[in-house]
Amino acid sequence: MEHPSTNYTPEQQHEKLKYYVLIPKHLWSYIKYGTHVRYYTTQNVFRVGGFVLQNPYEAVIKNEVKTAIRLQNSFNTKAKGHVTWAVPYDNISKLYAKPDAIMLTIQENVEKALHALNQNVLTLASKIR
């Protein structure tokens, strides 16, 4: 059973994707358990996604085995309304993941190093002139 989609404006979609990173398709299978993801379907429908339960996941859909990502809406399996669902990779056009603290720290450090490198290039360029 497919969940009815909520329609989000482009502005709402942009806001919901704040702090999320677009993951290249060849890296989808590396998204680990517990990561929160959002995605666009191949029909360009925005989905708010869920937490990764299994990835990759071999799902049987209409008697066909497909590589999928299995998601859940919470970690409390006993909570009212807890659901899991599988989304085949070939039904996803764009997949976004929320980075964890380690990745955010690495990104921050790379940005600082790049800024310092750019400053060094500017200093060298001014001395050459």
Curated annotation (Swiss-Prot):
This is Uncharacterized protein C129R. One of its GO terms (biological process) is symbiont-mediated suppression of host innate immune response. It comes from African swine fever virus (strain Badajoz 1971 Vero-adapted). Keywords: Host-virus interaction, Hydrolase, Inhibition of host innate immune response by virus, Inhibition of host interferon signaling pathway by virus, Interferon antiviral system evasion, Viral immunoevasion, Virion. Plays a role in the inhibition of type I interferon signaling pathway. Mechanistically, specifically interacts with 2',3'-cGAMP and cleaves it via its phosphodiesterase activity. In turn, prevents 2',3'-cGAMP interaction with host ER-resident STING1 leading to inhibition of downstream signaling pathway and type I interferon production. Its main location: virion. One of its GO terms (molecular function) is hydrolase activity. Its EC number is 3.1.4.-. It is an enzyme of class 3 (hydrolase). It comes from the Viruses.
